Amino acid sequence: MGGTFDPIHYGHLVAASEVADLFGLDQVVFVPSGQPWQKDRHVSAAEDRYLMTVIATASNPRFSVSRVDIDRAGPTYTRDTLRDLHALNPDSELFFITGADALASILSWQGWETLFELAHFVGVSRPGYELRREHITGVLGELPDDALTLVEIPALAISSTDCRQRAAHRRPLWYLMPDGVVQYVSKRRLYRAEPGPAVAVTETSLSTGDHP
């Protein structure tokens, strides 16, 4: 499952669980982007987003987190993500899960022509998005039936944008994301409207309940 995860929330986790059940996936690998090339806003540090994703997924044995995008230099492109995952799991059949709104801009992705050769794509609906296949595939020509699937996920009424705005205005984040992520956001002072003093990420700072 690819994404910025800034921050990760229950909508992401429910979407991953639902898609895993729908397609009988052995595991869901969360891949936080390193340097998202399409984002027009400030994105939190990659290590913060990675650690929040680890915290959020730790209790589910079906979930894991990969650093392939974070550890790769330069902007994050989905093509490179899928090629790296193939190299690490050469015998696995890959399903790439992402927001349906992201799939709508697929033609602007670098190397989009090769993407459908690398994985089955699953687009999950996000808040306010009208889920219509033709929005995504109208200019791509004919695709195999299993190349792209769109899935409605009601829990995606939760959005990372709203979570960031709530944190900026000191509004509660409880029940929108796992408790450990709420505590991590607070301890690291992420998304604050006015930046506070820097807090280093250390094992000690994560040992007070922020990390399972």
UniProtKB/Swiss-Prot annotation:
Name of the molecule in the record: Probable nicotinate-nucleotide adenylyltransferase
GO molecular function terms attached to this record: ATP binding; nicotinate-nucleotide adenylyltransferase activity
Record-linked InterPro entries: Cyt_trans-like, NadD/NMNAT, Rossmann-like_a/b/a_fold
This enzyme's EC code(s): 2.7.7.18
PANTHER family given in the database record: NICOTINATE-NUCLEOTIDE ADENYLYLTRANSFERASE-RELATED (PTHR39321), PHOSPHOPANTETHEINE ADENYLYLTRANSFERASE (PTHR39321:SF3)
Catalytic activity: nicotinate beta-D-ribonucleotide + ATP + H(+) = deamido-NAD(+) + diphosphate
Pathway(s) where this gene product acts: Cofactor biosynthesis; NAD(+) biosynthesis; deamido-NAD(+) from nicotinate D-ribonucleotide: step 1/1
Similarity comment text for this entry: Belongs to the NadD family.
Function: Catalyzes the reversible adenylation of nicotinate mononucleotide (NaMN) to nicotinic acid adenine dinucleotide (NaAD).
Gene field: nadD
Cited Pfam families: CTP_transf_like
Disulfide bonds: none
UniProt-listed GO biological process terms: NAD biosynthetic process
Gene3D superfamilies for this protein: HUPs
Key words, A-Z: ATP-binding, NAD, Nucleotide-binding, Nucleotidyltransferase, Pyridine nucleotide biosynthesis, Transferase
Keyword Transferase assigned: yes
